[in-house]
């Protein structure tokens, strides 16, 4: 939406899941539609002299190729000061990450760090500069951070190395190994992290890692039959299942742990592929075989189970239902929805129309309202879970007489509900 200086653009409200009225803005480049950092353009209106703070770093030994402090497991260490004096040891290939936040006087908000730099012996091996993110790379941010750790702790470690399939242009590796540090000499390696904001406020953290030669256990052998590769087209097939993951959708090669659940009377087997959340960069295609005939194949779809049920779409062809998926950690099966959406609890008072509208299966596609035959807008109030029409903003004349209202709800499988009533306004 183009806006101009002095133009009235929004009214703050508090109908969402928020603590106070506020306005969300995204800055995009009009030429590329990249997300861009608003502070690059607004810093003349903001005062910020507060330095970012790093809380801890994480070491990521490469499986089969590196050790950190004698272990192949990832490990975190707190920054009790800006210059850590404890001894760390490493051998082979190790990646690093950092948990850091930025702050600003006059605000209680916790902000992201604009620039993060990792140096080894004075040479920059990795740098991230959060100035822009291409729209098509948005989900790659999951791979830049330690996504698995975030899911468990809600702490965001920014990795100072790039996964093989991560092409975020804001990540800059100064080494041929994507920012992975190679400890191949028995000596002291001097590491330094610098975190800075867009105003130039920065803080530097240092620690020393001693290269200590030691035997590195071999990497666990992986099942080639269960592998998906980040740099090629993948076709994963089992009886009753076809999964197609295109090149460029994975941050790294991943070994699936496929599981199938057979339920009596179900339309298909239920398939899962990974033991925890693993988001793809974009949509992959999944096809499941239908076990028995249904009255209306257009009502079939694929449902994913991952905390909440989600409709993954679906088209039926030659005994298979094909939908889409972008989460390896969910489970998938065929579902059938020929039940219309629910319209209930209609009320008219205080110049407002309210109605409860929902669909517990494929999901609500649309809700349209008409007063005296003319379309009126019903807005969803998230906190209350109802749809509301403010009559003073609608093309409805206040006559003190009866008006007719018609509501039409349609779900994602084309099932339709119609509600009609009268109200005085």
Which sequence ranges carry the predicted segments?
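Short coil/turn motif common to extracellular beta-sandwich-like domains
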Residues: 90-95, 279-287, 346-354
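Proteolytic cleavage junctions
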Residues: 225-229, 293-299, 304-365, 375
């Amino acid at each position: 939406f183009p806006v101009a200086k002095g133009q009235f653009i929004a009214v703050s409200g508090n109908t969402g899941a928020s603590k106070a009225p506020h306005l969300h803005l995204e800055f995009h480049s009009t030429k590329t539609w990249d997300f861009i950092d608003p502070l690059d353009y607004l810093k003349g209106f903001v005062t910020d002299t507060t330095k970012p703070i790093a809380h801890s770093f994480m070491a990521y030994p490469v499986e089969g190729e590196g050790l950190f402090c004698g272990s192949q497991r990832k490990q975190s260490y707190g920054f009790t000061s800006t210059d850590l004096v404890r001894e760390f040891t490493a051998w082979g290939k190790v990646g690093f990450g950092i948990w850091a936040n930025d702050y600003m006087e006059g605000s209680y908000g916790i902000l992201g760090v604009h620039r993060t730099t990792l140096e080894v012996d004075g040479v920059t091996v990795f740098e991230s500069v959060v100035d822009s993110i291409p729209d098509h790379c948005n989900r790659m941010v999951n791979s830049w951070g330690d996504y698995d750790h975030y899911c468990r702790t809600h702490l965001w470690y920014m990795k100072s190395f790039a996964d093989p399939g991560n092409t975020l242009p804001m990540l800059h590796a100064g080494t041929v190994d994507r920012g992975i540090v190679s400890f191949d000499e028995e000596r002291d390696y001097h590491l330094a992290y610098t975190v800075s904001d867009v105003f130039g406020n920065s803080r530097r953290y240092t620690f020393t890692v001693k290269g200590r030669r030691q035997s590195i256990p071999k990497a666990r052998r992986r099942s080639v039959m269960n592998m998906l590769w980040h740099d090629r087209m993948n076709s994963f097939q089992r009886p009753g299942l076809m999964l197609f993951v295109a090149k460029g959708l994975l941050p790294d090669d991943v070994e699936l742990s496929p599981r199938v659940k057979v339920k009596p009377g179900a339309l298909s087997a239920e398939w899962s592929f990974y033991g925890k959340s693993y988001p793809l960069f974009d949509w992959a295609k999944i096809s499941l075989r239908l076990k028995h005939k249904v009255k209306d194949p257009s009502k079939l779809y694929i449902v994913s189970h991952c905390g909440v049920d989600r409709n993954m779409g679906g088209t039926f062809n030659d005994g298979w239902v094909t939908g889409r998926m972008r989460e390896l950690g969910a489970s998938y099966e065929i579902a059938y929805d020929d039940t219309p959406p629910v319209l209930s609890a209609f009320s008219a008072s205080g110049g407002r129309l309210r109605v409860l509208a929902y669909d517990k299966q494929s999901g609500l596609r649309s809700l349209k309202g008409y007063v005296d035959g003319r379309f009126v807008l019903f807005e969803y109030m998230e906190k209350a879970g109802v749809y509301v029409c403010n009559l003073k903003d609608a093309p409805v004349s206040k006559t003190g007489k009866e008006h007719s209202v018609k509501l039409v709800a349609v779900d994602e499988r084309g099932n339709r509900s119609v509600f009609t009533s009268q109200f005085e306004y």
